[in-house]
């Protein structure tokens, strides 16, 4: 092994991308390597507590330039609706001079990126190796981001007849297609021009999709494993939730969260609340206030709060999701199946019910429910609407001990969890990935 290397990280300005990049940075720093993490100034405060090695991981703040159409002060994807994503993308591209100045001054060995398609070209000029690092699933990349791919249509040779879109997914495809064409160009350009492809996944879950991407791009795909964060024992579950959950029997509580990007329409939000009530089980729902509402309370169905006051909570702020999933009282996780939440569900003991909204979430859902058969998807109408009855039926089907479907997904989930948490599996991915990077840097230095 040669000397330690210095890596730059430049992820898309969304916390769903920056946070797993920082988890990877922690793994590199744990092995003695240095990381310079480029991000918007506003994002630094929210990420600092995830930095376990502040002496080796240095945040390098970028000034986000003004772009017509981008609201004043918006610096991350959580500051804007999805429809304004193209303006944040334009602002990211305008940071190129700042990024290049940092590369010139600090001379890293590697630079990790995802949507900034111009990084490989810039990196080559400075003799830096570029690594495109995906924090979305391999199935999404295989379905959407191979050369010549078309939104919603599986490409030739795609390795699954189950991980696909259905007719009622048109609502999500339509929403995403607003800026899909440009995003597709950015990512496929990055894939074609980068030195190495890496994905936050493991072959036990997505091996055939990784093999397919390798064949399409004719280069090795490096896997990091899911890069789950280390448990933060210094920050136990808030007393508010610990005391509330302790009231209920083991495995009886439904926990529902739909990610930071999803804001429901008011009528769909109310249907979600009523579906939870219909199960008759205790529940904790953590979602953003719906469109047109400033608070959760003003949007709740009439009489709902009084009816569920002893066994149901709807919360509009951030919660400690991994710690809630680990609480003995929680037995079911209703999730949008974003890639991070997907992994958290797989290594939990909870039954899994899926309610996807965005394109990659839909494909992750089909992987989980149809390919791996470890979860149940909530049935939707052609418009994308789900009813309180369909939500309640999905939850009841996995929570009922006598349900044939519930027993099937419970058995399959338990087997898969056993594989994923087996000693050495996930650390093995990290070790091999870091060793490969070290060899890449050593070989480059010998050129």
Swiss-Prot record:
Molecular-function annotations in GO: UDP-glucosyltransferase activity
UniProt enzyme class: transferase
Enzyme Commission number(s) of this protein: 2.4.1.-
SUPFAM superfamilies: UDP-Glycosyltransferase/glycogen phosphorylase (SSF53756)
Binding site for UDP-alpha-D-glucose: 260, 319-321, 336-344, 358-361
Family stated for the protein in its record: Belongs to the UDP-glycosyltransferase family.
Full protein name: UDP-glycosyltransferase 79B9
Native species: Arabidopsis thaliana (Mouse-ear cress)
Gene that this polypeptide is encoded by: UGT79B9
